[in-house]
């Protein structure tokens, strides 16, 4: 969700937000948008839609090589680190109780628990089908740390992943790192990410630009 929101901000397109539950989304996950009556689901396809319809290019100024690098980084984040985050939130009982469990709080009491457990089971089945869910907790944490370390190395001392100005992949990275760094959920991968000051600064930089009120509250 954060990825799409930042991409809309980078594109300077006006938008509104509404609360939604993953189970009610067209593809069973958030985000999705409605644009002039057209429903578009999946953050990558949403970006494609926005760029084609409104004639924008979130990677404007990037060379062919840099665009390829951006795509490779995005795949590492969304096809690997994302699933490590899914594991820590859905597979670990303490974190599930703090977060995803509450998606179902507004359901009628007679179906709430059954729906909650069925949804959790489907997510864990998807995690196993992806492959990461077949590993032990310690192995998942180690693999998650590798993606965090790789992202930190790719960012280096730059303000953004591919230079002085943000591009599309920075929105993806921000969504992932902001999600991982939230202190609400306990995990070794989160603590490892906190030890990489450039990733924390990257998150804070985008927060200051697009969500200044959040930083003031945190202070």
Annotate each language-model stretch with its function.
Residues 1-113:
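GST-like domain detector, emphasizing the conserved glutathione-binding G-site
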Residues 47, 51, 71-74, 78, ...:
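Non-transmembrane alpha-helical segments in soluble domains
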Residues 83-200, 204:
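GST-like fold's C-terminal all-alpha helical module
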Residues 209, 213-219:
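Charge-dense, extended regions
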Residues 18-22, 166, 218-219:
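Acidic carboxylate-rich catalytic motifs and surrounding loops in phosphoryl-/glycosyl-chemistry enzymes
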């Amino acid at each position: 969700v954060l990825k799409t929101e930042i991409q809309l901000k980078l594109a300077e397109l006006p938008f509104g937000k509404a609360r939604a539950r993953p189970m009610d989304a067209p593809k069973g996950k958030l985000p999705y948008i409605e644009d002039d009556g057209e429903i578009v689901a999946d953050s990558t396809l949403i970006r494609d839609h926005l760029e084609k319809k409104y004639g924008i290019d979130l990677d404007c100024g990037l060379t062919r090589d840099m665009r390829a690098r951006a795509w490779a980084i995005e795949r590492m984040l969304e096809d690997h680190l994302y699933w490590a985050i899914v594991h820590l939130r859905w597979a670990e009982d303490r974190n599930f109780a703090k977060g995803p469990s509450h998606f179902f709080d507004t359901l009628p009491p007679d179906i709430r628990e059954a729906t909650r457990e069925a949804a959790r089971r489907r997510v864990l089945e998807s995690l196993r089908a992806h492959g990461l869910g077949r590993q032990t907790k310690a192995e998942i944490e180690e693999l998650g740390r590798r993606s965090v370390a790789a992202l930190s190395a790719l960012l280096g001392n730059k303000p953004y992943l591919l230079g002085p100005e943000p591009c599309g992949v920075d929105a993806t990275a921000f969504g992932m790192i902001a999600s991982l760094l939230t202190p609400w959920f306990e995990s070794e991968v989160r603590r490892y990410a906190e030890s990489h000051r450039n990733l924390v600064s990257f998150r804070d930089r985008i927060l200051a630009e697009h969500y200044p009120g959040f930083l003031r509250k945190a202070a």
